[in-house]
Amino acid sequence: MALYRRGTASMDADGTVHGTDTKWKDQLALIRVGATIVFLEQPIKLAVISDIVSDTELKAISTDGQTAADGKYVILLNDSLTVNGLAQNVAETLRYYQSKETEIASALDIIADLDMDNLNNIVQEIKSNKSAAEAAQNQAELARDSANSARDESISIKNQTQQISDSAIGSINAAKDKAITNVQQKENSAVTHINSEEAAAIQAINDAKGDLSGYVNDAQTAAQTATSAKNDAQAARDAAVSAKDAAAVSAQEAQDAANSVNADNLLTKDGNLSGLADKEQSKKNLAVNRLNQPRGDLTEIYSNDDRTGFKLIVKDSGDWGAMTHDGSENKALGVNFGGTGGTTEEQARTSLKVYKLDRTNLGEKHLDSITGEGDGPGIYMQSSSALATASRGYPEATAGMLEVLPNGANGASACIQRFTPFTYLGTAPESGNSQNEYARAGRGTFYIRMKNGNNAKFSPWIPFQASSSGNVVSSPASNEKSSWVDYVNALSSQPSSLASYNVNSVGWVTAISVRHRNGQGDGSAFGFVIEDASMTSPHYKDVRLRKQTGAGQWQSTQVIWNTGNTTVDSNGFIKRASPIVDIFGNGSHRTNDESEGCTVERISTGEYLIRGCLSLNSDLAWGGVNGGIEIPKDINGQPILWVDYDVNPDGSLVIKTYHRTHDNAPSFARNHKDGYSDGDPIDIPSDVFVSVRVEMPNDSIYNKKVEECKRNHERMVSGEFVESLKNT
């Protein structure tokens, strides 16, 4: 039969199927391994039978952990969804009952062989055997009667002989013994004969009894066998009739099922499920309704059963994506799933935080229209200098590249624009061939402007330029200058810059050059420069200012006074500094960079010993040849000490201080002090100090630093320093 649905069934998550009132092992059930069991619940669940354990237990595969509650079910015994499968089931059922009909026929043949005539013959034979036994018994009884007669006859003869003997005693005494002997012999012979006959009769009777017993037993056994055979035959006949009836019923059911099949309603293998009346409902029943193929090159998978949510599409071309069920809106694949997070280029760039690289020309677009908002940020190209006009927001009429970077200042439109013009610089240095001209940022120029989110306008373009070498810091080869004239002419011919120059007559000079209008137009005649003429030295003595007038002439350089090349004396005045030692009353001291290494010791009242120097340094600003000591003064500008000094043979200095009065001054300005007269030795007052300008030896700490800087610079120029760093 095509379907089996007896009883109810349930299924565990491990694939075990339990049945109630089922007969799954029954051969007539036609259940085989590989058959499909369908649980009739919502949604329908399917499983494939892998083992038939018992009438009430099956094992199933392909369950995916599904369970089914106890309820109605149906087992598809074969490919019952097709005519071929149904025919196979009907044929198998008929074959089963045909095999049973053979057994029934055999049983009927046995019954035919055991008909009543044969049974009667067997009974008559048994009865005949019984009559023969009874006849044998009668013969034995006759033999016994004959023996008895012989014995009686012998007795009669004996009696007769006795009578003869008695009658002839008197007349035949001589023959008495012989007669007795004869009689005795006859008697013995008779007795022997009688005994023999009696024994034979008894043996015959016993034999007859044994034969009769065997015949009786055989007859009883045969009767029992016949009865059993009859019973078996009757049972076989009944079973055959029952089986025949059941076969007829099953055959009728199969025929009815076959007759009830409408070929138009059957699914055929060749039809590939095309005959389903309601394909959509069938998909739901089989839990595949979320899969759809509206055309040959497109496959869709929906997010829910009623197809009202979203769907995933895949085309044969390889295109795929997610969208609403009706296709009205595409859905982006999130960044967390490996997507861009957007369905447009703008959304994707926003989600991934990247900027647009648009290699199409800006054309006639105004640069003010490209802001930090929306799809504005990115990199743009302008290939036409003719279109790069001021009316379109360009800083100069040159083709170039525009970079737009959002900065979020007070709104989404806030951004920074940077425009880099393209300029042909001529022949590529490595080729010398005019055909190998190449474009790069001309003269290191680029422009920047900004826009605030709450302001509709951009700021003016701000130009940025470097030296003619294209770098903010120049290389020795490009900025080698033969003289100061060559150096200042280079400053005049280039835009504002930060650079260093190797002036042959001086050494390395660092310069910050600010050009009027960035050197354009009349900007070549006006400029201002801050320079360090002793770049490789560890001091600030040669930090200078230069200025160019409108006529293009450079003015004399002006030294910038600073804490590195000046000192403040005890009276608060600035003086040009070299090695300076400040001495305090208690013997403590203070040095600057150049006097580092000097020490001071108070050796007595008003006497201080300075070691580590080579006497005083003569400088007109410090009093000429005999100068070099700055004396503290009062508020009226009058010295409050007398100072003297001695130079020791090793160059160390002894500074001596004495009390100093001004007797001709008003009383408040005479500097009188109790216990001290004018010229008495006295310590330096605690609120002032004496500054001494000293001469330092060549091996002083400062001079060693200067020499080390010079050597390092020479090593850097020669490349030795870089190589030493590589080897460390």
From Swiss-Prot:
One of its GO terms (biological process) is symbiont entry into host cell. Signal peptide: none annotated. Its main location: virion. One of its GO terms (cellular component) is virus tail, fiber. It is found in: Virion. Keywords: Host-virus interaction, Viral attachment to host adhesion receptor, Viral attachment to host cell, Viral tail fiber protein, Viral tail protein, Virion, Virus entry into host cell. Probable tail fiber protein. This is Probable tail fiber protein.
